[in-house]
């Protein structure tokens, strides 16, 4: 192999590595809900890049239970979510609910209790021992 051919191969490999790094870096991103479009069931997240610069995601669907059983739990502004984008491709991305935050704290720390808390203050509470259901 001649030097010029070797240089071309190395440059091609460098380009491939750079593309793979971008794909891996874009697979999972964490952000907060900026906008919810209830009609199209899509959400826009405020994300940041590796340098800390903020940017808005495109409107992407959020994950829900959607088989025979269905759920409707639209995200709310400020909620933390994870954007899963196969191969870093935002066109395929889906937003999934994430962790608690200062704005959206956990409703309990009791390991024996299950709570579903909704907007408007309504709460369903189940005690693991079967003693309570509210």
Regions found by a protein language model. Give the residues of each.
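Exposed beta-strand/loop interface patches that mediate assembly or binding
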Residues: 1-129
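Short, intrinsically disordered, charge-balanced linker/junction segments flanking boundaries
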Residues: 131-134
């Amino acid at each position: 192999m001649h030097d010029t051919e070797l240089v071309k191969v190395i440059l091609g490999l460098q380009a491939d590595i750079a593309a793979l790094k971008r794909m891996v870096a874009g697979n999972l991103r964490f952000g907060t809900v900026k906008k919810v479009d209830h009609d199209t069931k899509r959400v826009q997240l405020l994300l940041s890049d590796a340098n800390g610069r903020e940017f808005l995601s495109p409107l992407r669907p959020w994950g829900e239970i959607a088989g025979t059983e269905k759920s409707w739990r639209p995200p709310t502004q400020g909620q933390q979510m994870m954007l899963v984008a196969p191969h870093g491709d935002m066109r395929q991305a889906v937003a999934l609910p994430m962790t608690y935050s200062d704005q959206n704290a956990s409703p309990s720390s009791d390991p024996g209790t299950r709570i579903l808390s909704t907007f408007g203050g309504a709460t369903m509470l189940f005690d693991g021992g079967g003693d309570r259901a509210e």
